[in-house]
A protein has these predicted regions:
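A solvent-exposed interaction/effector surface
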Residues: 1-150
């Protein structure tokens, strides 16, 4: 699996979060349902994205619990029910997951068990564990769908 080390400039997002479990299959169900709710809330708040859309999903560990934070780049207005977050500039290990969502945890396994242990980099994981970047290349469960993992 190919990866790159890239410096990402600081950016800000607004989004919503949901608590996850310790079970992969259940978390896929929770996150899939939550994306539907999040996208509906974007539409209700007049935050729908059209051309050149981008969305992020952050995996956050807080007080021993796991949270999934769906977000978009910050706008001028932060609607009720949305949370604002600043993402600091760091060097990131970036991987592209290509394929169905069903294989996403296999990509994470490779990142954390094969790639990272064989690099000189140590994940900070202070603000979040990792995040996913979604853009026009993402297509639900398509074999050529692309999700960037940072």
């Amino acid at each position: 699996m190919k990866y790159t080390i890239r410096e990402l400039e600081a950016f800000s997002v607004i989004g919503q979060e949901v608590e996850l479990t310790n079970y992969h299959k259940r978390n896929i169900q929770i996150s899939t349902q939550f994306w539907r709710k999040f996208n509906a809330d974007l539409k209700k708040s007049y935050l729908s994205q059209f051309e050149n859309w981008i969305k992020y999903a952050f995996m956050i560990k807080r007080n021993g619990k796991l949270f999934y934070f769906c977000s978009i780049p910050k706008r001028n207005v932060i609607p009720d029910g949305f949370i604002y977050k600043d993402i600091q500039s760091y060097k990131y290990l970036a991987v592209e997951h290509i394929g169905s969502m069903d294989n996403l945890y296999e990509t994470y396994r490779k990142i954390y068990q094969e790639i990272l242990p064989n690099t000189d980099y140590t994940p900070l994981q202070e603000e979040f564990l990792h995040f996913e970047g979604y853009d026009y290349r993402f297509h639900w469960n398509s074999d050529n769908s692309v999700i960037e993992i940072w």
